[in-house]
Design a protein with these regions (language model features):
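N-terminal non-catalytic structural scaffold regions of very large proteins
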Residues: 1-367
């Protein structure tokens, strides 16, 4: 048995602070993933509905079984230290009201050792934490043809980027999910935040930037704005008002596809002096309006409004092992969703069971 090593210092100068248990960061992150992270991922994927909306699959509570082998056995026999993941899966037939519930095996999941490592095929490995840009709202400026350009970016933890810009023509533009730029006032009309020119002026002021933007904006109704935005986001697809509305809803306001995360919500609230609850991790109309007001004030050179330093550690965060694995698990679940929908449409509703619908291969492959 391995004896515990004791650290002894022969230095004459006392240490300024006791060395913290650095492995605890990895351990706590993984334990949080096993409980909260998996629950969040399953909740985001539920419910999965069939194309005719008759059948519905919902994920419930999950649990881990015991590892089949010890850490030492896995090292010696070139095996992976893992434990089975089991989840309650409920299948509901909305036409008959019949409910089938089963505890479904979701695959063997690599487990973390006490040293914060994983044993994969007998080899000890670690997941390295990443230093990434924190979700939130960021302001920047750059020179273009001798003119100062001001930009605002709303960056989520997961989902479409929203970028606003006061361009070299002094017009307020928006780019949704890195697509072609378009008038920001058209975007406000499409969302129903401000439909008429008077509404927009009342919301954002009557500056020269707003006047020039409204002059360029060809869509004067919400329906026109929705059609125009859909044309630019999905060129080639037949544009309809309903399709455009559901597209914008899915891109920016659907928790399954858009997530600021709690840290992103905190950063947005702090930057824009908002009081939105931390649990609200999708965009709100208030977020968009406050972002535009700050950008216009920044472009006008008003006191107290400044650009952000992207490289400042205050604008970065650590993405630890639990979050990294959760992101991979989320990818596997989204691939599995497509398989579940296909099987729902191919099998007889009365013969389907939760176990027959769930295919764990996409999840195992993603992890």
């Amino acid at each position: 048995t391995a004896t515990e090593r004791k650290r002894v210092s022969f230095g004459k100068i006392p240490e300024a602070m006791e060395l913290p248990n650095l492995i605890s960061v990895q351990r706590e992150s993984f334990e949080r993933f096993k409980d909260e992270g998996l629950r969040e991922a399953f909740k985001e994927s539920s419910p999965i509905q069939s194309q005719n909306h008759v059948l519905e699959v919902t994920f419930g509570e999950h649990q881990f079984g015991d590892p089949a082998h010890t850490v030492e056995e896995c090292r010696e026999k070139d095996m992976t230290y893992q434990a089975p993941l089991l989840t309650d899966v409920r299948l509901t037939n909305k036409e008959t009201g019949k409910i089938k519930e089963q505890l479904v095996f979701m695959g063997d999941f690599p487990m973390m050792t006490d040293q914060g490592t994983f044993i994969i095929n007998g080899t000890e490995r670690i997941v390295v934490s990443q230093l990434v840009r924190s979700p939130g709202v960021y302001y920047s400026s750059e020179m273009d043809s001798g003119k100062q350009i001001y930009k605002a970016q709303i960056i989520p933890s997961r989902g479409a980027w929203l970028e606003f810009e006061v361009d070299k023509r002094d017009q307020l533009m928006v780019s949704i999910d890195r697509k072609r730029k378009q008038s920001a006032t058209m975007f406000l009309r499409a969302l129903g935040i401000a439909v008429t020119n008077d509404d927009i002026i009342e919301l954002l002021g009557n500056s020269d930037v707003i006047k020039r933007t409204l002059e360029r904006d060809t869509a004067l109704t919400r329906e026109d704005a929705l059609i125009e935005i859909y044309r630019r986001l999905r060129p080639g697809a037949p544009p309809t008002v309903d399709a455009s509305r559901s597209l914008l809803e899915g891109l920016l306001f659907n928790p399954q596809r858009y997530d600021l995360a709690r840290v992103g919500r905190y950063k947005v609230n702090k930057k824009l002096n908002l009081t939105t609850e931390e649990e609200v991790t999708v965009l709100t109309d208030e977020d968009i309006v406050a972002t535009l007001r700050y950008l216009l004030s920044l472009a006008a050179g008003e006191q107290g409004f400044k650009v952000d330093d992207i490289d400042h550690f205050g604008n970065r965060r650590i993405r630890t092992v639990g979050e990294l694995i959760q992101n991979q698990f989320r990818i596997g679940l989204s691939r599995m969703e497509r398989v579940v929908r296909e099987r729902m449409s191919m099998q007889e509703p009365d013969e389907i069971t939760p176990q027959s619908l769930v295919n764990i291969r996409p999840i195992v492959a993603a992890i």
